[in-house]
Amino acid sequence: MPADFDATFVKLREILRPYARKMIVVHDTPENYYLDTKLTAPNGKPLMFAAVRKGKSYVSFYLFPVYMFPDLLKDLAPELKKRMQGKSCFNFKAIDEEQLHGLRELTKRGYERGREWVNR
């Protein structure tokens, strides 16, 4: 794994850390940081909020609110849109300050939009 992956993982994890006190921290390891809400989904499992996972080829940032509320992506910056894989995953080998700012704002909007299910 490239050394940049460690730095990228730490930066992405720091986006999620402020939300942890209102969530369930499922994983907090050097490779995986995962937050669930306190709400149970129809399948009986907790509803995911967000996660960061370090893989072999990239570091992934998952943000479930954009899956539930796709209109949150309407004004997404092109440099972040290029990083998307699927409906709620962003992949990075490295990340710059502009991308970090965009993800911070998107995460904040996702949290605010889903506040009713996040705080249950």
Question: Where do the model's predicted regions map?
Answer:
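Charge-dense, helix-prone N-terminal extensions
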Residues: 1-120
